[in-house]
Regions:
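Extracellular/periplasmic catalytic domains that process cell-envelope and extracellular macromolecules
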Residues: 1-3, 36-37, 76-79, 114, ...
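Structural recognition of the beta-strand scaffold that forms the well-ordered cores
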Residues: 6-11, 41-46, 81-86, 119-123, ...
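Active-site beta-loop-alpha junctions enriched in small/polar residues
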Residues: 12-15, 47-50, 88-90, 123-129, ...
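Cell-wall polysaccharide-cleaving catalytic domain and substrate-binding groove, primarily
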Residues: 1-32, 152-157, 166, 171
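Functionally critical loop-and-helix segments that line ligand-binding/catalytic clefts
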Residues: 129-183
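Active-site cleft segment of glycoside hydrolase catalytic domains centered on the general acid/base Glu
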Residues: 89-115
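Substrate-binding cleft of extracellular glycoside hydrolase catalytic domains
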Residues: 10-92, 97
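Aromatic-lined carbohydrate-recognition surfaces of secreted/lumenal glycan-active proteins
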Residues: 112-131
Length: 183
């Protein structure tokens, strides 16, 4: 908070690395508590896949919607917060139509009627975020603008519902910590 930040974006599930170097990337209850104790807010990110276009289907959206909901609830993410579902691959416009939009329809269906409600957001390229949001399937966009070579970022405007725009990563050095930080 003292460094000027107000939000912390963290993954709900998953691992980075593979084999003996695999380590969890998921936020812990202790980490969430520390975020709140520091006066910060959290936004949750759901990405539990090796992002390829074929992953994104209606059926996968149903499954991921339930997994993300359960992870957020079990972690203690406050009701009403966004979960940003990641579409972290370069989709051509026709693939957004054929894959990303059905995936988010599955997420919407999976979250219908849940007793603790989270809002659906999207992480992805400018075009993917815009198209999914224009379908009414995401209320907020976390734009992956660091992926400057993605066709979905080239020549497309930033979505009107953008909340976060990831455009740079650097090593943050604090009083007793160093870590990669996306801006």
């Amino acid at each position: 908070y003292n460094e000027g930040y107000r939000y912390v974006g963290r993954y709900l599930t998953g691992y980075v690395g593979s084999g003996s170097t695999a380590r969890p990337k998921a936020m812990t209850k202790e980490e969430l508590s520390a975020v709140f104790s520091a006066g910060l807010r959290v936004f949750a990110i759901y990405q539990d896949n090796n992002p390829v276009v074929s992953y994104y289907t209606y059926e996968q959206g149903l499954e991921d919607g339930v997994k993300a909901f359960n992870a957020a609830k079990n972690l203690g993410v406050p009701e009403g917060e966004f979960i940003y579902f990641a579409v972290d691959c370069d989709m051509m416009d026709y693939q957004v139509t054929a894959n990303a939009i059905p995936y988010f329809r599955g997420i919407r269906e999976a979250l219908k009627g849940k007793p603790l409600y989270y809002k659906v957001g999207i992480y992805g390229s400018r075009n993917t975020c815009t198209r999914v949001s224009d379908e009414g399937l995401a209320k907020s966009s976390f734009v992956g603008d660091m992926s400057t070579g993605y066709s979905g970022n080239m020549g497309y405007r930033i979505p009107t519902n953008w909340a976060f725009d990831q455009f740079h990563e650097y090593v943050f050095t604090g009083a007793s910590v160093n870590f990669d930080l996306d801006k």
